[in-house]
């Protein structure tokens, strides 16, 4: 069973629907016991870092997540991935969960290229920089869907994949059993479903 952590941020039910499409059992929950019983955890999220971190801390689930991530796979998606980092510079400086060494910084592409805007909204090719079971069902250069204005930086040792937005944008990270994708697998069509399938098999 996959527990989708509900802390009042993000479209949890489109993610649950994608997992159901794969024949996977998933529950949307803020219950610590359910999270402990789950085989895998997903931390979704959209919006601002500080607000999301405050809401997550208010649930009392941060210690539970840290404990469970020692024993089972955890996947952060979009803002959920950013929360995995040590800190963010979105509207000030804010501490994150600290699973991934690095920081979350503003997306600053070369705006001389008029086709590049912030936020990055849309499809971009995913370039795999390390072999990992998370990507066992996809090929180099498949397209995934992004919606973001900030990205993970200074995290080379954890980076699994990048996308080009005139600068290399961290697309996916891993630290131990903890994974993150800046893109939305649940919005990335068949490619995203294959990534979620791989996560369910970790």
What residue ranges belong to the model's regions?
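Short acidic/histidine-rich motifs immediately flanking catalytic phosphotransfer sites
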Residues: 36-45
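N-terminal beta1-alpha1 ligand-phosphate binding loop
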Residues: 2-24, 183-187
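Short acidic low-complexity segments
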Residues: 26-37
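Cysteine-nucleophile active-site neighborhood
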Residues: 49-120
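Amide-donor transfer/coupling interface in amidating biosynthetic enzymes
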Residues: 103-202
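Structural alpha-helical scaffold elements that stabilize or flank donor/cofactor-binding regions
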Residues: 34-35, 68, 172
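Short gly/ser/thr-rich secondary-structure transition/capping motifs
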Residues: 21-28, 55-59, 125-129, 162-164
